Amino acid sequence: MPPIKRQPRGWVLPGYRYLGPFNPLDNGEPVNNADRAAQLHDHAYSELIKSGKNPYLYFNKADEKFIDDLKDDWSIGGIIGSSFFKIKRAVAPALGNKERAQKRHFYFANSNKGAKKTKKSEPKPGTSKMSDTDIQDQQPDTVDAPQNTSGGGTGSIGGGKGSGVGISTGGWVGGSHFSDKYVVTKNTRQFITTIQNGHLYKTEAIETTNQSGKSQRCVTTPWTYFNFNQYSCHFSPQDWQRLTNEYKRFRPKAMQVKIYNLQIKQILSNGADTTYNNDLTAGVHIFCDGEHAYPNASHPWDEDVMPDLPYKTWKLFQYGYIPIENELADLDGNAAGGNATEKALLYQMPFFLLENSDHQVLRTGESTEFTFNFDCEWVNNERAYIPPGLMFNPKVPTRRVQYIRQNGSTAASTGRIQPYSKPTSWMTGPGLLSAQRVGPQSSDTAPFMVCTNPEGTHINTGAAGFGSGFDPPNGCLAPTNLEYKLQWYQTPEGTGNNGNIIANPSLSMLRDQLLYKGNQTTYNLVGDIWMFPNQVWDRFPITRENPIWCKKPRADKHTIMDPFDGSIAMDHPPGTIFIKMAKIPVPTASNADSYLNIYCTGQVSCEIVWEVERYATKNWRPERRHTALGMSLGGESNYTPTYHVDPTGAYIQPTSYDQCMPVKTNINKVL
């Protein structure tokens, strides 16, 4: 029989019916959302051709609609189709669209060609429909950063993307997506930054009221910065509850930050009146220190992190750093003239100017993006229900015997160990418990101080004056004094009072362990435990209020990294994103250094992909979970529950450790 006459299908992607050129308008039912968007795109092209226009040579409204239709589609076809027409938008002339041509002009005027990123490193809004495969595919693979990193956080100097005045460069993103392998958190905040230090670098002396305490020398800069280093910045209380109730471990994998919808305004004062005008020519300097070339800014537990509540304005903190240990270089030796050692240290004091790096200068209506990759360990959420020394069957006799020394006598005997008391090879972790904090109450000391005292320097204070206090390295040892318990302030909003939260004893049997040694008559506590073979312990349990990471110091050698607060030690955490107002000089009759008084506000969004593992258990009994039960009441009239707002708008923050929902309290693990 003669062959069936088939209609040509066009140059479509394999498995698709419309995603490609030259296919017929009626080629069957679209296979997915990307194919359906391509079908509508083909019909729009057909109408343009009928009107006498060539849509293949010009970027047009049909192309713009196609890109918009695929903004939430992360299938392979959607990525390829969207990428193709984004390239066309950047290089092809607009088809009778002056607004689009103006946007192209801003794109080329402000883009950084050396920092172009692949499709996979672009921001990923709209993750509510993502599957595990989609989320994995959308993670950044490579970033064109100015440094070569072998994992950890990297930052790219993304091109400034302009859309002109009155054209939005992005929408507000928020919410979280939970799946079996990945969790995606999305948050947006309104930020504001102002002129710092009159555009100058200055050295400030920070003195304490305690004369024998620590003094510091700080270099303050014209720059401010963004800090995303806290779990509460990314997880709502309900999201954190779900994460800690359903997953046995998690870790960050990729982070994308977008700064957009910039509005630069000039402050004009005329007597008692103040007006705020849009300034379309002023700019802000923005760059990311992806190679960690400047002193670290995102120290754990700082108060400058992104606000918990999405409607709160984020007032960026000024960036400053310590250039030298002040007590070692204050030139108070040799009768206050300074000795050779002090001068040698002072001569080598560094001075970091952030303007010494390439960066963008963005104007009103423009935007920029930064991408980071993480290479870090997991945060484990399982608790040990028994210590490792009880990993045995207590009904089965053991062949082990022990040597027993009789009380008050040199006589000894040998006895068989009972089945329920078998010895173990597993020892508690290392730690130090033999120190206490030095008073008085106004002192800024710590239980342990690390001091650097080069020979020849003149020291006229105690150890607190030239030492650095650090959290007691307790490993998994149980706190014997209050100094060893993690504490932090949780200030109730609007009260001005400091609410002190103290970490509770852990519910995991691989934490809060103690080592005792026998002396023939009793057992005594061992306060200092060094590192030995066969020590096993769990890391400190974190809460929603904890920092995510801490930066490892660049050192030749180090032992096992186990930060006291449970944060993740990273060689390359996300680089700090710095921002400052551009200096706009104005002429004066006296030739004084004068400039326009401006500030900048805009939106900053942060999206993090978290790798997760759901828990699986053979435990028959129900387990403990974080719930709303047990939350306290506060606020005006004392009837507003935690994580809610009272009639005055004050947000009721947690007042106890359990309300912060710590990990390692719910899911049991088999050792």
Curated annotation (Swiss-Prot):
Region of interest: Disordered: 106-161
Composition bias type Gly residues, residue spans: 150-161
EC number: 3.1.1.4
Residue span of region Phospholipase A2-like: 11-66
UniProt keyword terms in alphabetical order: Capsid protein, Host cytoplasm, Host nucleus, Hydrolase, Lipid degradation, Lipid metabolism, T=1 icosahedral capsid protein, Virion
Gene3D superfamilies assigned: Parvovirus coat protein VP1/VP2
Effect of substituting P21R: Almost complete loss of phospholipase A2-like activity
Signal peptide start-end: none
Compositionally biased spans, kind Polar residues: 136-149
Catalytic activity line of the entry: a 1,2-diacyl-sn-glycero-3-phosphocholine + H2O = a 1-acyl-sn-glycero-3-phosphocholine + a fatty acid + H(+)
Impact when changing D42N: Almost complete loss of phospholipase A2-like activity
Pfam family, any one: Phospholip_A2_4
Superkingdom of the organism of origin: Viruses
GO molecular function: phospholipase A2 activity; structural molecule activity
A single GO cellular-component term on record: host cell nucleus
Top-tier EC class: hydrolase
Function: Capsid proteins self-assembles to form an icosahedral capsid with a T=1 symmetry, about 26 nm in diameter, and consisting of 60 copies of three size variants of the capsid proteins, VP1, and VP3, which differ by the presence of an N-terminal extension in the minor protein VP1. The capsid has a channel at the 5-fold axis and there are densities extending the 5-fold axis into the interior of the capsid. The capsid encapsulates the genomic ssDNA.
Family: Belongs to the parvoviridae capsid protein family.
Domain notes: The N-terminus of Isoform Minor capsid protein VP1, VP1u, contains a phospholipase A2-like region. VP1u may play a role in the disruption of host tight junctions in the airway tract.
Subunit composition and interactions: Heteromultimer of isoform Minor capsid protein VP1, isoform Minor capsid protein VP2 and isoform Major capsid protein VP3. Isoform Major capsid protein VP3 is a homomultimer. Isoform Major capsid protein VP3 is 10 fold more abundant than the minor capsid proteins VP1 and VP2.
Protein name: Minor capsid protein VP1
Organism from which the protein derives: Primate bocaparvovirus 1 (strain Human bocavirus 1 type 1) (HBoV1)
